[in-house]
Amino acid sequence: MENFMVEMAKTISWIVVIGVLGLGIRVYGKVMAEQWRMRRKLTMQGVKGPPPSLFRGNVPEMQKIQSQIMSNSKHYSGDNIIAHDYTSSLFPYLDHWRKQYGRVYTYSTGVKQHLYMNHPELVKELNQANTLNLGKVSYVTKRLKSILGRGVITSNGPHWAHQRRIIAPEFFLDKVKGMVGLVVESAMPMLSKWEEMMKREGEMVCDIIVDEDLRAASADVISRACFGSSFSKGKEIFSKLRCLQKAITHNNILFSLNGFTDVVFGTKKHGNGKIDELERHIESLIWETVKERERECVGDHKKDLMQLILEGARSSCDGNLEDKTQSYKSFVVDNCKSIYFAGHETSAVAVSWCLMLLALNPSWQTRIRDEVFLHCKNGIPDADSISNLKTVTMVIQETLRLYPPAAFVSREALEDTKLGNLVVPKGVCIWTLIPTLHRDPEIWGADANEFNPERFSEGVSKACKHPQSFVPFGLGTRLCLGKNFGMMELKVLVSLIVSRFSFTLSPTYQHSPVFRMLVEPQHGVVIRVLRQ
């Protein structure tokens, strides 16, 4: 009898396993059929692309191209640094197919169909598309959930629109102008530190790795401007976010393939204990900060971004008490994570690249220095003088053209969507590779790979053949909320640094852009600084 029960249990187990596998294969087959249907819809409209394999799409070819590039990696120096088209090493398969199929093509990662779209007219259509049917790419946002949550950066539809209405007013231009002094205050400790480093060296010159100092300054700015606290309070949050950023990027969140398990069980978690632990720790730290803020501000009507988020969370949470509490907490923590990360990391990376480019072009340092001392008392920008810094603006715009922190504009068609004459089927993921768009000679001219801020002397509208092709802050309805704030912060930081120091690239600098959610210097930017 006992043996019979054991055999029966084994039989039932096998039946369950076979049933689950059968159901999974059936579901997977339906999804694969849907991907082929999407591809056929695109090819019937003249969109070509590399032929995919049955189950893995173009992933094997992507891996092969990537490995070939890694084995042939080069080091760049001098003028070759600026001219170096790093997209050919960071995303070589996209570059390879662009040369083969043109500015618009389709490819597959197995269970997802993608549309590469770098044609200026289609980018313009994407920019003008005022619809909630183009959202952020769902499988990417799921894999970024640990660092960005379901905040305003990653959410879609009415949930995104509601969050944007709450947060946007804090970044209107009139408010941003009032934050110039705050950025100056946050930058001063960094400048003093660099001066002290030079004194300790006992020399007039000193090699400085600028990246972490810029991150600290930018983190202090976002902490004080948006959350009413200094960087010292949020230091651990920023440190953990940086660790989480590196851990997530190591998992290749953009183009990895989970295939069968993704389809049957949903996009699986990263399966990384370190990521899980970091996520829990960050959320705990942010929630502690929020509760401390609530205790301190009882009866206070201070209207910074933190207060707007708290009020928005209260107004948007429905359901029973337990559900409301969890919904309130998720709303607040997710948006704080998004703003903590995007608000400081992008600015710090942009200034790092700007200093690298200025180190190679000392004549532009001189022009900035002259302009700052002409318009800013004691070389310190304020709300009135910052709008007069035209040269600084040109240099920053050229930096964002050559080294935009964000590599992609990405969208997923949540419904069939018409862009110009092209109908994008529901479920297709759209990718616009910003650095390639920014270096296209047909758009920017023969000097597209050169550092020439003069091209922006009459503004973005006259800088290139298709002004809508300048998209460092994204485009359309999903344009970066912090664009005005970010530009102001960049102007202040660059003005303060260049007015106090002249610099060249250190011989120890290794030019190696890397993609870690943003395009950043892998080994940091090392400049050889001379006190003015």
Swiss-Prot record:
Domain of life where this protein originates: Eukaryota
Residue spans, topological domain Cytoplasmic: 26-532
Protein keywords: Endoplasmic reticulum, Heme, Iron, Membrane, Metal-binding, Monooxygenase, Oxidoreductase, Signal-anchor, Transmembrane, Transmembrane helix
UniProt xrefs under InterPro entries: Cyt_P450, Cyt_P450_CS, Cyt_P450_E_grp-I, Cyt_P450_sf, Cytochrome_P450_Monooxygen
GO terms of molecular function: heme binding; iron ion binding; monooxygenase activity; oxidoreductase activity, acting on paired donors, with incorporation or reduction of molecular oxygen
Lumenal topological intervals: 1-4
Membrane topology, as annotated: Single-pass type III membrane protein
Binding site for heme: 480
Disruption phenotype: No visible phenotype; due to the redundancy with CYP714A2. Cyp714a1 and cyp714a2 double mutants flower earlier and have an increased plant size and biomass.
One cellular component term from this protein's GO annotations in UniProt: endoplasmic reticulum membrane
Requisite cofactors: heme
UniProt KW S-adenosyl-L-methionine keyword: no
Stretches assigned to coiled coil: none
Expression sites by tissue: Expressed in the shoot apical meristem (SAM), petioles of young leaves and emerging leaves, in sepals, stigma, anther and filaments of the developing flowers, and in the receptacle and stigma of the developing siliques.
Keyword Membrane in annotation: yes
Enzyme Commission code: 1.14.-.-
Pfam families cross-referenced by the UniProt entry: p450
Group of enzyme by EC: oxidoreductase
SUPFAM superfamilies listed in its UniProt record: Cytochrome P450
Segments passing through the bilayer: 5-25
Localisation: Endoplasmic reticulum membrane
General function of this protein: Involved in the inactivation of early gibberellin (GA) intermediates.
Note: Overexpression of CYP714A1 causes severe dwarfism with defective leaf development.
UniProt similarity note: Belongs to the cytochrome P450 family.
Name of the protein in its database record: Cytochrome P450 714A1
Organism: Arabidopsis thaliana (Mouse-ear cress)
Encoding gene, per UniProt annotation: CYP714A1
